[in-house]
Amino acid sequence: MIQDILKEAQDHMQKAIEVLKKEFATMRVGRATPALLEKVVVEYYGTQMPVNQLATISAPEPRLLVIQPWDKGALGAIEKAILKSDLGITPTNDGSVIRLAIPPLTQERRQELVKVARKKAEEARVAIRNIRRDANDRIKDLEKDKVISEDEGKRGQDEVQKLTDKFIKTVDELLKAKEDEILSI
C-alpha cells in the first residue's frame, strides 16, 4: 500500500520537474534554440498550431533561428504569431524563410529573467509540496482505517519527506543552473 503511494508521489514529483525543465527551455537567454518557439501558436487555416508543426526550425548560428515553413503560404501567419508572442524578437521575412536574430540581453532583461526563473522554480516547489501533502494524507487515512500500523505510517511519511527533499533539491539545482546561464551570457 505505502509503496504504491510512494511510487505515485515520485511519478507526480518527476512530472513537476519535467514541467519546470520545459519552462526553463522556453526562456530566452540570448542563445538561439528552437525550444524558444515551442509556445508560439500560429493561426493557420482557422486552426491553432504550434510553429514546429508548420515549419522546420534550425539554429545555424548561436544568435540566429531560421524558420522554413513547409507551405510558403504559412509565412505571414508564422510572422504574425511571432510578433504577437512575448518573445520580444522582430522576425525578418524574405519570402521563403523567416529569420529571427536573437539580440543580446540587457542587464535589466537578465534580472527580469532571473525573477521569472525563480517564480517558476517556486511554482515547482509548491507543486512538489502539494504532492507530499496528498501522499501523507493518504498514508494517514490508511493508518486511521487500521490498514497499516502507526509505525508503518510514520516510516511511510519519512519516505515521502525524503522524496520531497530530493526533488526540491533538484529544483534548486535546475534554478541555479538557469540563473548561471542567464547571468553568464
Curated annotation (Swiss-Prot):
Name this polypeptide is given: Ribosome-recycling factor
Keyword Nucleus applies: no
GO biological process, one term: translational termination
Alphabetized UniProt keyword annotations: Cytoplasm, Protein biosynthesis
Task performed by this protein: Responsible for the release of ribosomes from messenger RNA at the termination of protein biosynthesis. May increase the efficiency of translation by recycling ribosomes from one round of translation to another.
UniProt-annotated location(s): Cytoplasm
GO cellular component: cytoplasm
Family as reported in the entry's similarity comment: Belongs to the RRF family.
CDD domains: RRF
Species of the source: Carboxydothermus hydrogenoformans (strain ATCC BAA-161 / DSM 6008 / Z-2901)
An annotated Gene Ontology molecular function: ribosomal large subunit binding
SUPFAM superfamilies for this protein: Ribosome recycling factor, RRF
Main location: cytoplasm
Alphabetized Pfam families for the sequence: RRF
